[in-house]
Amino acid sequence: EEQQEAAEYIFSEGRRLESLSLKLLDLLVLKKKDFELRPTNLQTVIEGAVHTALPSMADKNISLKGRYDDGFCLMESDLVKSLIINLIDNAKKAIDDSGNILVVGRLTEEGCLITVADTGRGMKPEELSRITEAFYRVDKSRSRAQGGAGLGLALCQEIAELHHGQLIFESILGKGTVVKAVLNGGRTKCE
């Protein structure tokens, strides 16, 4: 039994390190690469991210829903989908037993605004100023157990900046968190 537990621990740590390596690589690539922002249907990106994240909610009593405006904005769709999935994953980790996650996409004059809101634990104001720092984790013991390395929000911040935007955080301890990804890549009327 001890050997089985040790093997499972080694396997889970190996997966965590692999995930960490991939996120570090993503950060390095983002800093060096030029991206072309293409007309993308906001609905397609949000539905894709929600569909990808839904299976990870199976072990918890979490409702995950998406709402969006109909239309196109300029973005790198794979990166924005990754941003949304990372924000959903963080929201899921903030919910202990049951709760709700809502992903909302709105078209703006400059591009789009993607909001991910959860009914999780929330954060203290002093934690909000550091959460996009690479390797920073609000709850180190919990995120280690859940596979977090503290790179997801740093990656999201880079993606937002590539879209001439930013991340905005609002949180109330014990009530939940809202993350707004302001993406100012531009708007378009056609595919």
Model-derived features: positions:
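Acidic ATP/Mg2+-coordinating residue in the GHKL
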Residues: 118
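Conserved micro-motifs of the catalytic ATP-binding
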Residues: 31-36, 68, 72-78
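Short conserved segment of the HATPase_c
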Residues: 123-137
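Short beta-strand/loop element within the Bergerat-fold HATPase_c
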Residues: 98-110
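Conserved glycine-rich
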Residues: 164-165
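Short helix-loop "hinge" at the ATP-lid/N-box region of the Bergerat-fold HATPase_c
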Residues: 90-92
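Short alpha-helical segment of the dimerization/phosphotransfer core of two-component systems
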Residues: 12-17
